[in-house]
From Swiss-Prot:
InterPro entries: Ribo_uL30_ferredoxin-like_sf, Ribosomal_uL30_bac-type, Ribosomal_uL30_CS, Ribosomal_uL30_ferredoxin-like. The lineage of its organism: Bacteria, Bacillati, Bacillota, Bacilli, Bacillales. GO terms for molecular function: structural constituent of ribosome. HAMAP family: Ribosomal_uL30_B. Part of the 50S ribosomal subunit. It holds the Pfam family Ribosomal_L30. The keyword GTP-binding does not apply. PANTHER family: LARGE RIBOSOMAL SUBUNIT PROTEIN UL30M, MITOCHONDRIAL RIBOSOMAL PROTEIN L30. This is Large ribosomal subunit protein uL30. PROSITE patterns: RIBOSOMAL_L30 (PS00634). One of its GO terms (biological process) is translation.
Length: 60
């Protein structure tokens, strides 16, 4: 069973490139401090790596 990750948007996407905004939206994050729980897959880890300066990640 894959581990679960709790991903929280902690910095705003205002002024960020469109690809970073799209990645945040694809993770399911909308507003600041919104949190989603996702399974740890290579795709999700790649998305987190791309916007690591905007999000915080914890094990759920």
């Amino acid at each position: 069973m894959a581990k679960k990750l709790e991903i929280t948007l902690t910095r705003s996407v205002i002024g960020r490139p469109q690809d970073q905004r799209a990645t945040v939206e694809a993770l399911g994050l909308k507003k600041l401090n919104s949190t989603v729980v996702k399974e740890e897959t290579p795709a999700i880890l790649g998305m987190i790596n791309k916007v690591s300066h905007l999000v915080t990640v914890k094990e759920a």
